[in-house]
């Protein structure tokens, strides 16, 4: 799971002002994202049959590139189209209920603080998304930025749980994020609003891979 979190692209139609979401996602897939989440929220978000139809089209794209397709906070849609997994927040469906309904799917959980981490049923989730790293405009209900604090604190007590950082992340922050113990980054605007999506995605993937290699080298020296 940790390798799958290297470059996690989160996107919905409201995040794509320059191009159609299908074009955006396909370009990101071509350029090296490792996981995709369909997060369809906002005032102009698709609903009902339109949302289902879009999810199916995005799922087909992800299958073509062998990238897992995750749906945000809509377990019924996950079940309906047999998506690869579900991502939920602290105030969404309880994770034990999600696992009961999706025994063989990927389940991710958002965590912001150590208090949230400590109260979460981590035994039934496959990864946690920690953030927001920086203040972000992509989520209207975003919590205060936590930087690397929570990631570092979690890694001190849990070396095994897969962690992805999210929230206002650009390539400038990748090194510090990986050094703090994250296994990858999740981005929205850094890809969806980029002038050149392929170039932006490749740069992010390059920075993540470089940071992971450097971290492993330091770990090997310490051993």
UniProtKB/Swiss-Prot annotation:
EC number: 2.5.1.3
Signal peptide extent: none
Encoding gene (name): thiE
Annotated coiled-coil segments of the chain: none
InterPro entries tied to this protein: Aldolase_TIM, ThiamineP_synth_sf, ThiamineP_synth_TenI, TMP_synthase
A GO term from the CC aspect: cytoplasm
Record flagged with keyword DNA damage: no
EC class of the enzyme, as a word: transferase
Annotated binding of Mg(2+), by residue: 73, 92
Protein known as: Thiamine-phosphate synthase
């Amino acid at each position: 799971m940790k390798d799958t979190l290297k470059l996690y692209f989160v996107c919905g139609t409201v995040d794509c002002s320059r191009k159609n979401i299908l074009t955006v996602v396909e370009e990101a897939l071509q350029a090296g994202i490792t996981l995709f989440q369909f997060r369809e929220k906002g005032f102009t978000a698709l609903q009902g049959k339109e949302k289902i139809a879009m999810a199916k089209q995005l799922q087909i794209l992800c299958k073509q590139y062998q990238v897992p397709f995750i749906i945000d906070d809509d377990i019924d849609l996950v079940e309906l189209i047999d998506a690869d997994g579900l991502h939920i927040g602290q105030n969404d469906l309880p994770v034990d209920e999600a696992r009961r309904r999706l025994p063989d799917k990927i389940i991710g959980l958002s965590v912001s603080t150590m208090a949230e981490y400590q109260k979460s049923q981590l035994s039934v989730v496959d990864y946690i998304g920690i953030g927001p790293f920086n203040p972000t405009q992509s989520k209207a209900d975003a919590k205060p930025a936590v930087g690397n604090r929570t990631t570092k604190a979690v890694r001190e007590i849990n070396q095994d749980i897969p962690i992805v950082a999210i929230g206002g992340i650009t390539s400038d922050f990748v090194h510090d994020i990986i050094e703090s113990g994250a296994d990858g980054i999740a981005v929205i605007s850094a890809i969806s609003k980029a002038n050149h999506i392929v170039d932006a995605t490749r740069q992010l993937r390059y920075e993540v891979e470089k940071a992971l290699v450097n971290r492993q080298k330091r770990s090997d020296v310490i051993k």
